[in-house]
């Protein structure tokens, strides 16, 4: 929650107990070995250098108005450690920190928006909204962008094969064989990670893709049938969007990884994970 009266993520005024004037949150995270350690100057006297601590405060004044304070020196230091680690290792990713409230639903699928360079910035993986619900709008925008990139790669690959003089002299089966072989060699780690994660969590879901012609729409292959995403039950739609948005965040934080879902790490909080799921789906979560 971003309080306009103070910089940073802080607490709500109503989080303070009725008989108290102040609330405090202590946060401690373990620093991975490959990131480094806090310098001696940034440590408190009895704190291990492999841990990073910071505190959030909210204090009520005499008028009942809360003022916020955050002690984030160690947090700033660990951010610097990650920045230095990424400079020395391009495969180094950032940790996932995400929270999904209990109210999760698909309001609309924004797959019309495109060519937004901000979609792939790692900062978009850390969005934490003050509103008490999630609509997964960022996931659908991201899905459109990565699908467009894959289609552009396939079109370029097809054009290169068409312009290959040696293939022009061969028969059609030879051309199709080369096309299939070249497509297998093409890497699309973001879409591959998405589809693998969805298939793992929802085995009945065979594919999720954007259909461009004759009309732009989101399609699925579910239980052996091709259908519109909107035709799925609310339970399945929400679960696809939730898994997809987690994958989106991991891909943004591990942009150079071929397996972002397997190599990424962090903290993921899902409130009432079985909320709005049907009985059969809730039993296997």
Features from the language model and the residues they span:
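Glycine-rich, flexible loop segments associated with nucleotide phosphate handling
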Residues: 21, 49, 179-191, 260-271
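Amphipathic alpha-helical domain-onset/packing element
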Residues: 94, 136-144, 150-213
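P-loop NTPase switch/coupling surface
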Residues: 1-154
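Hydrophobic, Leu/Ile/Phe/Ala-enriched alpha-helical segments that form helix-helix packing faces
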Residues: 78-89, 194-205, 246, 250
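Soluble or luminal CAZymes and related metallo-dependent hydrolases
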Residues: 74-77, 186-193, 238
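Glycine-centered tight beta-turn/hairpin loop motif at sheet-sheet or coil-to-beta transitions
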Residues: 31-35, 203, 224
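Aromatic-acidic/polar surface patches that form glycan- and anion
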Residues: 16-18, 89, 183, 187, ...
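Switch/communication elements of ASCE P-loop NTPase nucleotide-binding domains
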Residues: 1-7, 197, 207, 212-285
């Amino acid at each position: 929650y971003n309080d306009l009266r103070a910089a940073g993520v802080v607490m709500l005024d109503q989080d303070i107990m009725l008989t108290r004037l102040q609330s405090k949150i202590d946060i401690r995270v373990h620093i991975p070995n490959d990131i480094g350690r806090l310098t001696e100057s940034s440590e408190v006297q009895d704190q291990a250098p492999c841990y990073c601590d910071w505190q959030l405060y909210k204090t009520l004044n005499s008028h009942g108005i809360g003022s916020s304070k955050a002690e984030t020196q160690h947090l700033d230091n660990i951010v610097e450690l990650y920045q230095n680690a990424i400079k020395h290792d391009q495969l180094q990713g950032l940790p996932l920190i995400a929270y999904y409230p209990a109210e999760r639903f698909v309001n609309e699928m924004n797959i019309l928006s495109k060519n937004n360079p901000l979609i792939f910035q790692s900062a978009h993986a850390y969005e934490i909204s003050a509103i008490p619900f999630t609509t997964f709008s960022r996931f659908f925008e991201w899905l459109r962008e990565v699908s467009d990139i894959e289609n552009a790669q396939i079109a370029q690959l097809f054009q290169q094969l068409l312009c290959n003089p040696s293939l022009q002299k061969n028969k059609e089966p030879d051309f199709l064989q080369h096309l299939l072989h070249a497509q297998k060699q093409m890497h699309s780690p973001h879409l591959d990670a998405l589809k693998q994660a969805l298939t793992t969590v929802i085995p009945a879901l065979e594919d999720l893709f954007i259909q461009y012609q004759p009309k732009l729409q989101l399609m699925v292959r579910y239980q052996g049938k091709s259908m519109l995403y909107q035709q799925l039950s609310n339970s399945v739609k929400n679960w696809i969007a939730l898994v997809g948005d987690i994958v989106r965040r991991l891909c943004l934080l591990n942009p150079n990884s071929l397996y972002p879902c397997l190599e990424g790490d962090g903290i993921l909080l899902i409130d009432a994970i079985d909320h709005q799921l049907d009985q059969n789906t809730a039993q296997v979560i």
